[in-house]
Amino acid sequence: MNLGTLVSETRNPQTMDLDALPTPELVKRFNEQDTRVAEAVKATLPDVARAVDAAVAALKSGGRIIYMGAGTSGRLGVLDASECPPTFGVPHGLVVGLIAGGPGALLKAVEGAEDSQQAGEDDLVALNLQEQDLVVGLAASGRTPYVIGGLRYARQSGCTTVAVSCNPDSPIAREANIAISPVVGPEALTGSTRLKSGTAQKMVLNMISTGAMVKFGKVYQNLMVDMKATNVKLVDRACRMVVEATGIGREEAETLLKQTDFEVKPAILMALTGLDAAAAREKLAAHQGFLRAALEH
């Protein structure tokens, strides 16, 4: 493949004079380019929705969401995966981020790590990949061998696969069941895909993980009711969520949360139904953790 023909590698005619610009104009040019990202992502929403549904299906069947990528793409996957346990109360390992070159590549580039298809396969083998897992390959260029190898192995293993790339009709898209390709155009700094391409990938990942967790019962209204209250800020947020979802006073909300070890879902159910903590937990379990269903039935 001639990499110079990739949209993400071509020069942007609107930023050819970056090195001659005064600082206010320089940052204005960056911002002008960034405004195009949301529109590019918008064009992919039907495919993003399919990916969300695939992620929900994986979770409901006992599978995992596994992101894999190299460089910026890999770091974004690891970032999104690492935010899921505190935000949604899911166990570590339910959403996994793999980066070419291993954890050390998060902080320091590992030269050549992305160039091995076998490494992508090996990393999935090490995770004991199961057919109910969803594998999401991330590569701005759409041709990273590490990701191609991983997606190919995942498909051979019976997994549903998703490819997220910022070039049209990319090699990784051809390896996936679902292709998400927000084409953001040439970068302001030629080939620096940590810019618009990285932003687009982050937006897509936000929707996949958050959408999946909404559909998996981790959200009530627009509240993260399975959040782990692990610090002062989050304890305060837990109290506010109970108050906002039920209309009770803060003091009563704190009393209920102390009875539930600061778990928000049972506290809301207790406030709205009069159940005690044990009965509230039991009712939630009977409705697979979906608070709305527990309240309506």
Curated annotation (Swiss-Prot):
Molecular function terms from GO: carbohydrate derivative binding; carbon-oxygen lyase activity; ether hydrolase activity
Any one GO biological process: N-acetylmuramic acid catabolic process
EC number(s) recorded for this UniProt protein: 4.2.1.126
Pfam families assigned to the protein according to its UniProt record, in alphabetical order: GKRP_SIS_N (PF22645)
Gene3D superfamilies attached to this UniProt entry: 1.10.8.1080, Glucose-6-phosphate isomerase like protein, domain 1
Induction (record text): Induced by MurNAc 6-phosphate that releases the repressor MurR from the DNA. Repressed by MurR in the absence of MurNAc 6-phosphate.
Enzymatic reactions: N-acetyl-D-muramate 6-phosphate + H2O = N-acetyl-D-glucosamine 6-phosphate + (R)-lactate
Residues the record marks as active site: E83 (proton donor), E114
Domain of life: Bacteria
SUBUNIT field: Homodimer.
Protein name per the record: N-acetylmuramic acid 6-phosphate etherase
Species the sequence originates in: Salmonella dublin (strain CT_02021853)
